[in-house]
């Protein structure tokens, strides 16, 4: 190997990327809204009075109040609606009407069910029963605690059905189908609070996607940086099922760690020049606030691939990783330089994984339609 191995780094996001200089408004998770709706409906059932707002507890201990959009008695039960406010987060469930229908049951305790618009779990790996509603553990616990604030569950039985009008349509814009959740959205949330543009939630979704692939018996995951790279990856590996393809964004390191943790045997990474350059420099969390494209590395790759001194200088002075790619392409050096770049990325990922998994790397063009370079199983 004719170059110094870079140190491996998986930096955290800086505080300024988590808390924006101009404060963005937080919102409420589907789980928190479902909890508020359940408490409102049960309050109406018990007291005969429809509350205009209800207070619930969040997992961290904070108490918050939610306006109730609609609440009424129905036959032997009651129904309430809380409209989700996702704050400034671009959430497909913003404005969703989290609806709780409650009634009595003959045995003490709480029975929690999913109604129309709430997804059904069809595959293992989510920590939820296959065949049951996609209501995660924290919302389940929150709903149970809220119900227990209204009635004594050791003495009476309560049935709560959570539904979401248009939930099945909303779910089309989520990864639910890939994870094996069909028919609607998931009732989610670990804190009750939606933090705008939450990188933490994206990282968690990446880890969960790898976990689901492993739970379904898959041995390889294909890490893609976005929709275009995923299209290229699917063309490259058409034999793999959809669950194997994971959109990692900036969280390659987290995905590789999850693959090792869950005993997978192979990781393939498919990306474009900029992300590959960051990974080749040993940076496993590639958010723009924590890493820049190392153009000197690309200049060194240019020289190693047989490029002229003038080309290496031009690549080192390029504006972006894409600009460097275009310079390689114009000089007829895209294949050799791209292969070397992929080889460096493969070496980094193998070191990061501790040689626990086989690693393959491919670079696609900026449409995602064409693989232009590779290392590993596709090495030319």
Swiss-Prot record:
Keyword Lyase: no
Pathway annotation from the record: Cofactor biosynthesis; adenosylcobalamin biosynthesis; cob(II)yrinate a,c-diamide from sirohydrochlorin (anaerobic route): step 6/10
InterPro entries per UniProt: CbiD, CbiD_sf
GO biological process annotation, one example: methylation
Signal peptide span: none
Enzyme Commission numbers on file: 2.1.1.195
EC supergroup of this enzyme: transferase
Catalytic activity: Co-precorrin-5B + S-adenosyl-L-methionine = Co-precorrin-6A + S-adenosyl-L-homocysteine
UniProt keyword terms in alphabetical order: Cobalamin biosynthesis, Methyltransferase, S-adenosyl-L-methionine, Transferase
GO molecular function, one term: cobalt-precorrin-5B C1-methyltransferase activity
Key word Repressor present: no
UniProt record similarity statement: Belongs to the CbiD family.
Name listed for the protein in its UniProt record: Cobalt-precorrin-5B C(1)-methyltransferase
């Amino acid at each position: 190997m004719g170059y110094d191995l870079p140190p491996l780094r998986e930096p955290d996001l800086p505080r300024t990327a988590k808390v924006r200089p101009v404060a963005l408004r937080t919102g409420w998770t589907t789980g928190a809204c479902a909890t508020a709706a359940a408490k409102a409906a049960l309050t109406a059932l018990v007291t005969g009075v429809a509350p205009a707002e209800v207070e619930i507890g969040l997992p961290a201990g904070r108490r918050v109040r939610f306006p109730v959009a609609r609440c009424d008695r129905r036959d032997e039960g009651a129904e309430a609606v809380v409209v989700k406010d996702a704050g400034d987060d671009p959430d497909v469930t913003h404005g969703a009407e989290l609806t709780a229908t409650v009634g009595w049951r003959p045995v003490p305790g709480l029975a929690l069910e999913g109604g129309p618009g709430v997804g059904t779990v069809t595959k293992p790996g989510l920590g939820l029963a296959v065949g049951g509603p996609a209501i995660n553990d924290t919302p389940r616990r929150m709903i149970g605690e809220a119900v227990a604030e209204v009635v004594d569950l050791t003495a009476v039985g309560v049935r709560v059905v959570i539904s979401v009008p248009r939930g099945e349509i909303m779910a089309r814009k989520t990864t639910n189908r890939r994870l094996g959740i069909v028919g609607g959205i998931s009732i989610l949330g670990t804190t009750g609070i939606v933090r705008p543009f939450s990188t933490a939630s994206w990282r968690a979704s990446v880890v969960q996607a790898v976990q689901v692939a492993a739970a379904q018996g898959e041995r390889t995951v294909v890490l893609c940086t976005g929709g275009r790279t995923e299209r290229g990856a699917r063309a490259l590996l058409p034999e793999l099922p959809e669950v194997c393809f994971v959109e990692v964004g900036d969280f390659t390191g987290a995905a590789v760690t999850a693959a090792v943790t869950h005993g997978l045997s192979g990781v393939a990474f498919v990306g474009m020049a900029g992300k590959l350059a960051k990974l080749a420099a040993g940076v496993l969390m590639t958010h723009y606030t924590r890493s820049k494209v190392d153009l000197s590395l690309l200049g060194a790759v240019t020289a190693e691939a047989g490029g002229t001194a003038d080309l290496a200088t031009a690549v080192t002075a390029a504006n972006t990783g894409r600009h460097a790619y275009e310079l390689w392409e114009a000089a007829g050096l895209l294949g050799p330089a791209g292969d070397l770049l992929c080889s460096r990325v493969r070496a980094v990922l193998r070191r990061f994984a501790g040689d626990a998994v086989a690693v393959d790397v491919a670079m696609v063009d900026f449409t995602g339609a064409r693989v232009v370079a590779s290392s590993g199983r596709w090495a030319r």
